[in-house]
Every structure is written in C-alpha cells, then in structure tokens.
Amino acid sequence: MTGEPDSGTIQEWLRRCCGHAGLRLLSASPAGGYSGTRTWECEVTGAGSPGHLVLKLYRPGFDDYSGLGPIGTACKHALALAELSGHGIPTPRCLGFASTGDEAAIAMARVVGSEWSGGTRAEAAGVLATLHGMRTGDLSPELAELVSRSTPNRGRVGETAGEPPLAEETLQHGDYFSANIAATGKGICVLDWDLLALGDPMWDLGFLLEADRGVDVEEASGAIRAYRAVRAFDKGRLRWQRACWRAYWRGRRLSDAV
C-alpha cells in the first residue's frame, strides 16, 4: 500500500465520486481507517455540494476478507448503501462511487451518532432480523452477484467445539456491533457494509450480543426478543456463537492480565 493520500488526492477522489468538478475540499479529518482502508470526514464547498460527507478509500493491501479486491468491495458497499434503505435497513446515503486503476472510493453522507440508549441494541436486533429476512432476489443483479461471490466473515479466536449444522444462509452484515451501528435522533443507522455476504445469520446476532464487552443479561434478552418478533432463529447455533465469543473474551482477559 502506498503512502497516506494528501489533501489534493482526497479532493480528486471526492470530485470523482460526487461527479462535481468544482467541489473544493476545506478540511479532511481521519475517521477510522480500520482493516487497511482509509476514511475521512470531509468538509467541502461548491455549487450543489453536500457540505459535510465521508470518503472511504480502498487500495491494494487492505484486509480483503470478502475476497473481492478494492474495486469489488467498494462497489458492493456503495450498492448496499443505495439499495438496502428501501428494504427497511437504515444506512448512510451513498453520494457516489469511483475507481481508477486498482483503487476505488465511495462518498457517503456523514452520520452523527450519539450514545446508545437502553433500547438501541433491541432496535438493532429488529433491523438485523429484517436484513436476514431478505433474499438475494431483493437486490439488484450486480449487488446480488457481488454478495454471492463474497467470503462470509467467520474467523474468530476462541472458536469452540461442537458447532451445530448450519440450517440456512442469509444475507450477513459480518461486523454487526456498536462500532458499526450509529444511534441517531431518528433511530439507528447501520454502517460499513464491506463484509456483506451470504452466511450464518446467527453469526450476526451473536456479534450484536457478545462483541461489546459488558452487555448485561436484560439488554441481551431484549435484543433476542426484538429479533424473534420479526423472524425465528436457530437457538442451537446462537448458543454456539455466544459460547465462541465467551471463549474469545476469556482469552482476552488472560492476555490482558499478563
């Protein structure tokens, strides 16, 4: 992966994504950049410009969990933002996608999140159940093809024996926990669709219940009830996914104590 892009490079990517040659970058603050991608919160000006937006850049060398490469992953993310909101999945508004050579970027509306309330996890569980109730036929052919080619997220330290058989595959977000679920005044907004694939729905629900440290029993139970109100779930696989997470956290505690 080449060096960190300068402001001129960021501005050029914004212009390509938004289709606005007169757009001018006023400021760009790093925001995340996990898994080898680069993300900035940007302030821009120019006729018709959105004012504040987010740019995410994909380059060779990023952690390509889905196996689609920079362009395929960015395209999948952009299409997911454009399509899923029409199916009851709240996402940031996609402002554009662009690629050049072996690099790609997407621009999206900035989402200002607030602290989670006691009911945020349950709300997120209901949205997750809606996602799991969708089928690839609900997606555009291009997005469905990218999703079907994606390797589902699965790797986790602490995986335990006794995995039950997988009864169904559904659309799977792949990284569904507080870091990618923004609480807003209008409800939640689900971020970061790089790992969207066909996989185990209980991976997602287990992630929501266990990937954040310190989720209490009442909060987790409320989330399970909210999910169950929308669709049935595999209790055996959910128990196994949660057991895997508990093994992971036990390992983390031991590691932190050293």
Annotate each language-model stretch with its function:
Residues 51-98, 116-130:
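A conserved alpha-helical element in kinase catalytic cores
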Residues 62, 115, 181, 198-200, ...:
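Conserved protein kinase catalytic core
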